[in-house]
């Protein structure tokens, strides 16, 4: 852990330098590949890890090698992972999905922004230096049209986004020929449908059934299509965002790029500080992954942080503002009902969700029902016009082990199920947010209740944390719960960083949280038996047994840390080919001994075979040529 503390000015300067010098970068010994779909502009990015050959025999002067296949892996880094792409943050990313959106002919450009707040910001010349220069002209659905992926799925139409996703979810495993790499243990999937091969039609069917969502606002054409659902790979979300006391636009863009490099499938901008609108524009125009927000945070800023002063009109304006910028999914705390708030009085830690506490305070102050619940159909109408997915927030999630699985939590969950059905009436895609703090033996009930109450809509959880005693290590405490609930069927895991409960995460914290959660998600995929999930593990194990150190580093989720730890004790180049590491040394390496045992066993088999043949030869009279028996 770094002990160097930078001043605010130094942090901003460092982030600005990162942005100014940003270029497409591949991981060590990896290359970017593209798998093409049925039309030329469906080009699905993957990272292919190149491996060295295995020494199988020969002599020192004439060694014999056997090639090892490259291993393709899912890649969330977008253009930032392609060394051939010129990166310019000032201009933003290429608009990958724009031709697909235009071809559907179901949306139109707006003459002006629908949000009064957006119009005010654009008219403020004092913001010119902060503003992203290449602003898009926003689109919305034409009158009488719905533009959502759910709408098209229900019509039986496979969109280019769905085909892109099918290719992506298969992870290029059809390229693998080695039986060693293809071997996979059967999983326990708790009722999930995991086809051997994911087709565009399967993607369409899952979206149509509401079991999966494709967050893809028509005003975020830069994003690469991805899917969230329990019958697909488990996804990971990273949270970024400024606060009233720290961070800047430069730092948030840096964290966005950093998040996608380390595997974030989506990113939530949870900014609560200054210049929220401008920060979000920079993030969206440079994001290859879907962006989510919690609109109530910005709505609260618009009323000077006074929850009692919130109004539906201010919130509605915020939804329009963010939808026309391109936000792909909104967290809406519409399930925090007035009658549920007293249920939290007996809790140890009360209401820990920021959005939940804001709405609870508003309800009690006015003694009225939650205006998000009351206006939910209007929220759905807005989302349907831009294809903004809804992430129904768990405002009453437990904030401590003692409060897990209580009446308030599950009452809200049942209401979220009712709201899900309403959203589906408008062809709006929905996922459900979940806890929180839950001990291991109580986690599975959360998944079971969600599937039953919310009609199998995708579940999206924060951890859950499995113990409360480890501040500073809550990426571990929650990673345990995340792996478990991912196995049980959770579709997306919201990462937790080492700074959880302590402070705003920095760049290194983001990386640590993501690595922890990529481990949890992958462990869940293995346990479910997701087709192809074990390929990378098999490749790593083979490289480990064959002492191919460079391949071990490069197959790791974090090649740089793996190499650094190895080189702390064996930094010489000879250490990269040694048949041992510093843990056991040359004489006690179990894998080296195992290889020797295998070689010895093979030699013994040959000797036994020769002895058997010798005995057979003598038993037949010792003749070189045996007489042919007469018929």
Swiss-Prot record:
Enzyme class name: lyase
Binding site for Zn(2+): 437, 501
First and last residue of the signal peptide: none
Biochemical pathway: Cofactor biosynthesis; thiamine diphosphate biosynthesis
Coiled coil, from the record: none
InterPro entries for this protein: ThiC, ThiC-associated_dom, ThiC/Bza_core_dom, ThiC/BzaA/B
One GO cellular component term: cytosol
Entries under PANTHER family matching the protein: PHOSPHOMETHYLPYRIMIDINE SYNTHASE, CHLOROPLASTIC, THIAMINE BIOSYNTHESIS PROTEIN THIC
Function text: Catalyzes the synthesis of the hydroxymethylpyrimidine phosphate (HMP-P) moiety of thiamine from aminoimidazole ribotide (AIR) in a radical S-adenosyl-L-methionine (SAM)-dependent reaction.
Protein name: Phosphomethylpyrimidine synthase
Organism: Salmonella paratyphi A (strain AKU_12601)
